[in-house]
UniProtKB/Swiss-Prot annotation:
UniProt name for this protein: Aquaporin TIP2-1
BP-aspect Gene Ontology terms: water transport
Residues where N-acetylalanine is found: A2
Record key words, sorted: Acetylation, Membrane, Repeat, Transmembrane, Transmembrane helix, Transport, Vacuole
TM region positions: 21-41, 55-75, 99-119, 142-162, 169-189, 216-236
Function: Aquaporin required to facilitate the transport of water from the vacuolar compartment to the cytoplasm. Does not promote glycerol permeability. Its function is impaired by Hg(2+). Transports urea in yeast cells and Xenopus laevis oocytes in a pH-independent manner. Transports methylammonium or ammonium in yeast cells and Xenopus laevis oocytes, preferentially at high medium pH. May participate in vacuolar compartmentation and detoxification of ammonium.
Cited PANTHER family: AQUAPORIN-8
InterPro entries: Aquaporin-like, Aquaporin_transptr, MIP, MIP_CS
Residues modified to N-acetylmethionine: M1
Domain remark text: Aquaporins contain two tandem repeats each containing three membrane-spanning domains and a pore-forming loop with the signature motif Asn-Pro-Ala (NPA).
Induction pattern: By ammonium nitrate in roots. Expressed in roots with a circadian rhythm showing an increase after onset of light, a peak approximately at midday and a decline to lowest levels before offset of light.
Compartments, as annotated in UniProt: Vacuole membrane
Length: 250
């Protein structure tokens, strides 16, 4: 069984840990700048028209590509979490200590906030869009949607990046993570906004000064990420036994 490790402050303030926090800050800043920037660009190009299908696809693709890059550039330094829900899920599965995870959260939230204020500045003060549950849906539906799509994201992180049995699959981890996020935004964007990432929702909320319904984007992703970590960490990584399929079985 995987266990949660509290860790020590000495380890969390080592040079390697400080580098990891900086890497998380930079990766999250770049991801949020591109992701939120794509939503701002869409609003400008369409004169604030309602989101349509081409716009949803463009924003989903932008988030997927940006996360692919953000994870890849941080992978060898911090693991490329770029998301408090990913960090939480990995902590639940014993892949990162709680203390280090808290500092990851701080770096991620600061990176997202910095990205959104930079966007507000370079766009001449254009509105920074925030996540919200679609009209006609309740907060509970939004939470459930975020639980499901964040579970899919963190499960993908475990399968392609955290699992020691991943083998050559690890080389495509950033791509797989980017793809699942893009796909989930296509599926959930019109309903919950498709956040999967408390930091992605936090920065825009701070920059816009609008925290209405913001709790949905903490509760849903943290439950989904925690469940993925609990299940994958204990069921699929809890045993060292692994029998790969023979090549003839593919």
């Amino acid at each position: 069984m995987a266990g949660v490790a509290f860790g020590s402050f000495d380890d969390s303030f080592s040079l390697a840990s400080l580098r990891a926090y900086l890497a998380e800050f930079i990766s999250t800043l770049l991801f949020v700048f591109a992701g939120v920037g794509s939503a701002i660009a869409y609003a400008k190009l369409t004169s604030d028209a309602a989101l349509d299908t081409p716009g949803l696809v463009a924003i989903a693709v932008c988030h997927g590509f940006a996360l692919f890059v953000a994870v890849a550039i941080g992978a060898n330094i911090s693991g490329g979490h770029v998301n408090p829900a990913v960090t939480f899920g990995l902590a639940v599965g014993g892949q990162i200590t709680v203390i280090t995870g808290v500092f990851y959260w701080i770096a991620q939230l600061l990176g997202s906030t910095a990205a959104c204020f930079l966007l507000k500045y370079v766009t001449g003060g254009l509105a920074v869009p925030t996540h919200s549950v679609a009209a006609g849906l309740g907060s509970i539906e939004g939470v459930v949607m975020e639980i499901i799509i964040t579970f899919a994201l963190v499960y993908t992180v475990y399968a392609t990046a955290a699992d020691p049995k991943k083998g050559s699959l690890g080389t495509i981890a950033p791509l797989a993570i980017g793809l699942i996020v893009g796909a989930n935004i296509l599926a959930a964007g019109p309903f919950s906004g498709g956040s999967m990432n408390p930091a992605r929702s936090f920065g825009p909320a701070v920059a816009a000064g609008d925290f209405s319904g913001h709790w949905v984007y903490w509760v849903g992703p943290l439950i989904g990420g925690g469940l993925a970590g609990l299940i994958y960490g204990n069921v699929f990584m809890g045993s060292s036994e692994h029998v790969p399929l023979a090549s003839a079985d593919f």
